[in-house]
Amino acid sequence: PAEDFPEEVKIHGFDNNGAGLVTSGRLMDHYFSAAEEAIRRATQFGARSVSKKYAQRTPFYFRGNDAKGLPKLFQTGRFRFVPETPYTDLYGRHYRGGHIGFLPLYRQGGVPRSGIYTIRVRAAAVGRVHDYGKALGDFRNGDPLVMEIAAVDRRGSVTSTGNVSKMISLARIELTNEEPKWFEWQVYMEAGYEPEVRFRNGPLAAKRMVRVLTTQAAEKPEFKPFINMKPGLEKGHGVLKAYKGPRLRVWEIKVEGPHVEAWPSAGHRALYGDLTPSQLNAKTISRRLEAFAEQAFRRPPHKGELEPIQRLVTNKLREGLKPLRALKLGCQAILCSPGFLYLNLGEGELRGVALASRLSYFLWSSPPDATLLKLAAAGKLRPNLSAQVKRMLADPKSDRFVRHFVRRWLDLDNIGTMPPSADFLEYYRDNLETAMRAETEMFFRNVLDQNLPPREFLDADYSFLNRELALHYGIKGVEGNALKRVSLKGSNRGGLIGQGAFLTASANGVDTSPVVRGIYVLEKLLGYTPPSPPPDVPAIEPDIRGAVTIREQLIKHREIATCAECHRKIDPLGFALENFDAIGGWRETYEAKQPIDATGKLPGGATFKSVSEFRKRLVERQDQFNRCLTEKLMTYALGRELEIGDRPQLDAITARLKHSKTGLRDLVEAIVLSETFRTN
């Protein structure tokens, strides 16, 4: 329901800052629509929902009258044909003909209800080891084949190849089995979506494969009959039928769901309790609105707070609106009221539910659970804050804290907004965007769980990689799609500054800029935001001929008096990372083959000759990093910028980090126990 909401305003990367939250008429329209949709989905009067089964065997493509009215995804196209075998092979990449739709659910407009569905696919990986060499591009010989299950919405925009504008990746698995095997997942799908099987790491688009195989692999006997044949369906089908390279072979797809654990659901009970539509009247509706508001507001409604909504519902009932519709309207109004939309904790010392809410939204990004509310009601939350922090960080819901904080601190949500050019093929082929984010989040999670000191973010000699990310980093011996701890000893990487997400978020997707990366390091690791450049100073234009290096351009730029001081602080930090390209790959030269100079001198006089030495210089400024990290965490926890009055608490917490045994979990606990956190 909230997918069309405009993005929140970010202040220094954080979108939970109250000062930046502005409610517009357009946003209120979205709130009303989302509330109406949420109530519609939660309403479950009537008989228990029955799980349904759907199945489709090969062929997954059709021709002639069988294909009439179907989108091209299901039709035999230029390089698709109805197989004579009991299976269908996928040859190409997922985005160009390398996917299989699911006709039974397409015909009825997707799954009927949102919920958990079981998806089963009978498939195999065929031809992983081949002798086609570079004809298959960068596909690595012997690699597992990656099968992806996606949820797609074909009710909107659909391209000629069957691609859709709304696609959600649900699961991926690596296949090495050459004999058919069933694979099963339980996944959540929204109503109207349907599943799709994709060949995620297919070597080439099918159309291109026919051309490449009959030129670059023309010596292979299986392709000789087609070398001189005119391009067309016969040639395309013949080449692909003779092809012996990597193929994702699919026999059957089954879908079952939605699986209903409780009927009616918790959402339905929150709205209606145990009442049926016939039991709704002015009195029961009033009681339900009171009960629903207490859950929605995360506290009992203030005196008179519900009067406008109760009055609205009463008037609508008098006008003849049916009781069920009147209750829905009242609940919709509650979900669009300030009590629900804003986390209003009051002023002064936080107690009870207010303190429980701040703690829960900090560590779980959700309302307080029954344990917190029970302690709050009994007046026992304050003396038990330490124990609750430990309990909450051990709960899987704390993954939200890790994900939300890390992405806002390091601007990781920006990855993908300026995707790299097609020159960085591996970024798309190996799904590096997802792996990079996961690496940094898992790294943060490890530091938190192990209660390691913040210094770990600066010079840790390990990270969490899968095969694709390790190959991107030039590290051998890592197998599998799952991220695992990997030693970085002997490499140029270590700490945050060697991670792909950090390096990609500080670039623009096309090239690197020492100025942009330098500012990023200053803001994210050292806690200093340089002033904006003077309006009369021209921007640095890259020399696309490659005749002048960026260092030479910046030396010239620093001759401008108004620029010199800031660039003295910024440029060395960016040049230290110049050996990393726009997606974090290692390079020794620029595109014009000019050698990269990653040396530098910091304002304090310390010098470095490489990124490894720069990492040591950062460790020497560990106190500055500790203060920066503490300030970022407090800003996220409080939902506001720190003020002058917060400095004593910031100083006291940061001072604790000078002890080598103080870890990240200790830091989070110290923030929660601080007067600043417990006061609004």
Language-model regions, residue ranges each:
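Low-complexity, glycine/serine/threonine/alanine-rich intrinsically disordered linker
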Residues: 1-680
